[in-house]
Amino acid sequence: MKFGTLFIALLLAGSTAQAQIPTPTSEAGPWSLDDCIRYAHEHNIQIQQQALQVEQRSVELNTSRHSRLPDLGANLGTNFSFGRSLISNNTYADNNQVSGSLGVSASLPVFMGGRINHEIAAGKLSLKAAAQDLDRIREDVSVNIMSYYLDVLVAKELVDVAEQALALSTQQVERSREQVRTGKVAESVLYENEALLAADEYKLTQSRNDLSLSLLALSQALNRTSAEGFDIVAPTFDSLTVESMRHLRNPAEVLSYALDNRPRIQAERFRLEQALRAVRMSRAAYYPQITLTGGYGTNVYHSFATGAVNPAFGRQFRNNSTEYVGVAINIPIFNRMATRNSVRTAKLGVRSQQLVLTEAEQTLQKEIETAYYQADAALLKYRSAEKALNSAQVAFRYEAEKYAAGRSTTFDYNLSLIHISEPTRRSYI
């Protein structure tokens, strides 16, 4: 749900995710989002497995298409016989002999009740569904990488916030030391500021640890061999990035587009059409099947009996040959309700696939609606944090001036500093 929601949120903002052909990515230097997605598409095991499934469906379709072609086979045989046997004068005599046979046969399906046509159509639909599944997995992997990439960006920004807070705390401690030395403030003020400095150092350490873990998670999601030296580059944002969120597309409009374009929905629709074809394939067993057959055969022999006359092999090959052509018609009459139950089973498969498609469409609608309201709430939250940050920055400047002039307490100064840090953190989370 997290990945689907993130993708729909991007879709609501007018972004589209397109599957790209993977290309090798350099290990050196910071990685961009495109680098990460391309690398993931190339090294993700699920994508590779599904690509094999697509290839397998293509092979199966090729098999179905070639089922229209005739079967052609040949046979060769040789027999050796030894001992006494009945001869032409109705007596037994020693008659060792060798005989051989050669045959070629073929059969051609003429009418199979339309089963072959339906098998080919079902194979095409199966191939299309597998290709859509491949696009869906690529899409899921892309959104997964986007999510981890965003986590790293947030962690980087929080490190920057913690570093800025630490820099201010360090300046405050140095200022307090000078004020204690000149007798302007009590020594307890210095201790308070040093405690605040220690807290900010802890926050910075924690933020850096979180960043390291985020980079590790992204590296593992990419299936890299090691996370050592791995880093990313932040994308360039401008005012249009946030401005685009101010004009979110209506959920109904997004749903209409997604129902016609999301790979998951398209795959289930292809499977529904495939299930309908399965019903027609089952019904084909009600019709007669017509097969055309033909063949050629011949045989030769040689007797080792005394006085035996053995014609030349070439003459035997010609004179003993036989050819045949036939038509076989298989008419189904009663097969213990097997065909009827096969059709009923196929119809149940159609109903089951209709439910799967309906569930997928309902899930998509929920994801779109959830993403829409989450994006809208995030925009409102961002605006509130932006206003709070601007107000806190103005208040901090005045508080810093008052503190420098000795007209404010350390507590008020530190509180004003906290008021800057919190809106800044909320704007990234």
Feature locations, PLM:
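Small/polar-residue-enriched beta-strand and adjacent coil segments characteristic
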Residues: P30, D71-S85, N90-R136, Q266-A278, ...
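Single conserved hydrophobic/aromatic residue that forms the stacking wall/gate
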Residues: H419-E422, R426-I429
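Bacterial Sec-dependent N-terminal signal peptides
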Residues: M1-E27
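Amphipathic alpha-helical coiled-coil segments
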Residues: Q49-S64, I137, V141-D160, E178, ...
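Bacterial Sec-pathway N-terminal export signals of envelope proteins
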Residues: A19-G73, G77, G83, S226, ...
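Periplasmic alpha-helical coiled-coil/stalk elements that build and connect Gram-negative outer-membrane
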Residues: D140-Y257, Q374, A378
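Transmembrane beta-barrel architecture of outer-membrane proteins
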Residues: S99-S101, S147, E192, T322-Y324, ...
